[in-house]
C-alpha cells in the first residue's frame, strides 16, 4: 500500500508536492587561481575503501562531494583541516589540467542544531544563518576554494524526497511507526568502505546519530530515511507525510542531483566513514542501481586539543574566528595546518602557530628579495609532493629549502631588494606576468599561492 501510494504521488510535479519557498544558499568568494609554467602530475590519494593510495583518474572534469558543517557552532581547527584537504585536492587537479566540479552541503536542519537553538532560546533558522555566515568568513580568510554548489539540506528537500520515493519503489525502505528506514540488506556493498566488524558498527552507530536499539527495525543498523513530524520540530510535506530527512540520504540526493553518476571523491573527516559515508553510498547505489557511488572515499584525520579529538560535544575547541579576532594572520594559520598530513591525527598547540608565524616571516622575506635561486626545481618538487597523497608537509619543506638558500645568498637580510609590493612589467619565460624585479622570487610567490593557497603578500597595518 505504501509503495503504491508513493508511486502515485511521485507522478505529481515537484511544485505541487512542496508548497514551500526555497532559497539557494550562496558560497563564499573563491580566491583567484593563477597560472603556472607547465602542468602538474596526476593526483594519487589514499582511498579508505581499498586502504591504498590510488591514482585518481577523473575525466576532463573531476567531481568532488564533501560533507559540510552542521551550523550550530563556529568553525574549529578540525573543520579547517578537513576542508584544507579538499582545497588542496582541487588545486592539484586544476594544476594537472582538470576542471573541477565541487559540491559541499550544509546540514541546516538536524538534531544538534535544533537542540542548541532550544538551549539558547533561538530560532533554529537564525542560529544556522549566523553560523553559516561565520563559516563563510572563516573559509574566505583561509583562502579555501569555494564549492561550485553550496547546498543547504532545507533547499534540497524535494530532491531528497524523490530519492526516498525511488528507494521505496525498489523495496529498499520500510515503515517503523510513521518513520521510514532503509534496509541495508538491499545494499550488497554495505560495509566495504569502512571495513568494520558488525560489533564495531553497532557501537559506532549508537554514538553517531543512529538508533540501533529501536524496536521494529529489520536490522539494528538500518538508517533513518524520513523522520515523521514531531511536535515542536520543523517539517516539510512529502508523499509519506510531513517530516524531515534522515542524515545520510541528504548527501546521497544532493551529490546525485549536482554531480550525477559516479563521482570521483566523496570526502569528509574520518569520523564520517561510518555510518555516514557507508549509508549515503548505499542509498545512492541502490536508488540508481549503479556501483560504486564514488571512485575514492577520502577521509581527513582528526585534530586534537588537550589530548582529545576536537569536538563540539566535548567543547575542547580552538575556533578559527577567535584566532582571527586575536589578530592571527590567516595565512600563518593556514601554514600551520599545512604542516600535517591529512591521513595522520595530530594535536594542536600554541607553539605550532608560533612556528608558522616564524616560517611565514621567512618566506615573505625571501620572496621580497630582488633575486633568488632558480625556482623551477621548487615548482617541480612542490608538484611532486602534493600529487603524492597531498603531502603538504613535504611541499612546505621544499619551500623551506628554497627560502633558506635565498636568504643565505642574500646574507640573511629580510630588507634586501625593492619594495615587494611594487609590480613591474612581465618577464618572459616564467609562465605569466611575474614581477620584473625578480623572476625566481615572483614565481615562488605565485606557486605558493596557487598550489598551497598561502598569500605571501606582506600584511599591511590596518588603515594604511
Curated annotation (Swiss-Prot):
Binds 1 zinc ion per subunit. A motif ('ERGGDP' region) lies at residues 207-212. GO terms for cellular component: cytosol. A motif ('KMSKS' region) lies at residues 309-313. It is an enzyme of class 6 (ligase). Its EC number is 6.3.1.13. GO terms for molecular function: ATP binding; cysteine-glucosaminylinositol ligase activity; cysteine-tRNA ligase activity; zinc ion binding. It comes from the Bacteria. L-cysteinyl-5'-AMP binds at residues 67-70, 82, 105-107, 247, 269-271, 303. Its cofactor is Zn(2+). SUPFAM superfamilies: Nucleotidylyl transferase (SSF52374). A motif ('HIGH' region) lies at residues 69-79. Keywords: ATP-binding, Ligase, Metal-binding, Nucleotide-binding, Zinc. Coiled coil: none annotated. One of its GO terms (biological process) is cysteinyl-tRNA aminoacylation. Monomer. Belongs to the class-I aminoacyl-tRNA synthetase family. MshC subfamily. This is L-cysteine:1D-myo-inositol 2-amino-2-deoxy-alpha-D-glucopyranoside ligase. The lineage of its organism: Bacteria, Bacillati, Actinomycetota, Actinomycetes, Frankiales. The gene is mshC.
